[in-house]
Amino acid sequence: MKKTAIYFFTLLLLFVSACKSEKVPNVSNAQVYTRVTFNRETTSATTRINQYFSDKYRKGAFNGVVLFAEKGNIVFEKAFGYSDFRKKTPLTTNSVFQLASVSKQFTAFAVMLLKERGKLSYSDSVRKFFPNFPYENITIRQLLTHASGLPNYMYFANDYWPDKHKLMDNRDMFSMLQNNRPEPYFRPGLRYFYSNTGYAVLASIVEKVSGMPFYKFMETQIFKPLGMENTFVYNPQNPLPMNVAEGHNPNRAPVGFNYQNGVVGDKNVYSTVEDLLRWDYALYKAQLVGQECLTEAFTPAFKNLRDDHNYGFGWRINEKDNIVYHGGWWDGYRSYIVRSLGDQRTIIVLINTAQHVPFHLPDLEELF
């Protein structure tokens, strides 16, 4: 994975059908899977990785938590810097971060789970669940693969949301779409265009189909069954846990209130590096959904995209090198996960500053 997985990790930093499986456990008897067995043996990779990130930290160019793993075993794990710069609270490997767009893979997985349960089909139209949805012929599959053409709520909300001191949520986003009908970017299915709106719509579909708030569905159907004890979807009615790292601006001041923080599905999953490793492990073991379903999620959806820029269900894909990956940034946080499916090597980096991250291919090639 030295030159392939690291390449796509660097790329992220620079640019930021039936499924078959065993029966999915119900909420009442959900199995908590055995935690990943961690192996912290000192290796030459440990020394290289530690020196690299330590140098970046000393130069003020990195503040976050890093985890490198192989087949579920930790090769390197370390926290660098502060959770809160004002209070000088140190980060730990148990610090919780906003995952930003890395959240999309969890939203996609929720849809996959409901599909396996026979509750929906990827070919279903959004209007099947929301008859008054103002755009025709948009399917769940198109939402999953960013082919819907929906306008970006992060832009049109600036025009239509009247009180920027009040939090908006998914229902408010739907109301703005319905009342104002902002122009779509293209007709559904025409091409790929990354869509935060599409994944927020998917979260609302999960709520509609399951009869549960999105945060509760994710907690009871995914996070708890997989033993992800420090992972949750943001709910403004619940205070954030004490171990949530503060998001910071480039000048290391805390990021203030953002009225769009109430929208979920495209962002707003919070997690730790070790919980993300449990997630990684669950995907390799095809827990909760079957391997056929995961294979479809990791299959490129577009024939005309460059291989390293293709997309599946919540994951960017490099089919040639058998790598899936995603990055995210939002309100003082950056997040990155790279999974080499062949040799089961995984890189997870969570950052709580919005500054440019100076990672370059020549520096990273030999780390892992």
List each model region and its residues.
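Sec-dependent signal peptide recognition
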Residues: 2-10
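C-terminal motif of bacterial Sec signal peptides marking the signal peptidase cleavage site
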Residues: 15-18
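Bacterial Sec signal peptide processing site at the extreme N-terminus
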Residues: 20-31
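Short, gly/Ser/Thr-rich active-site loops of penicillin-recognizing serine hydrolases
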Residues: 21-22, 40-43, 354-368
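Short, conserved catalytic-motif segment at the N-terminal edge
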Residues: 38-97, 119-123, 181
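Short active-site loop at a secondary-structure junction
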Residues: 57-65, 86-143, 186-195, 264-267, ...
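Short, surface-exposed loop or secondary-structure junction motifs
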Residues: 137-323, 327-331
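Short, well-ordered beta-strand elements
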Residues: 336-353
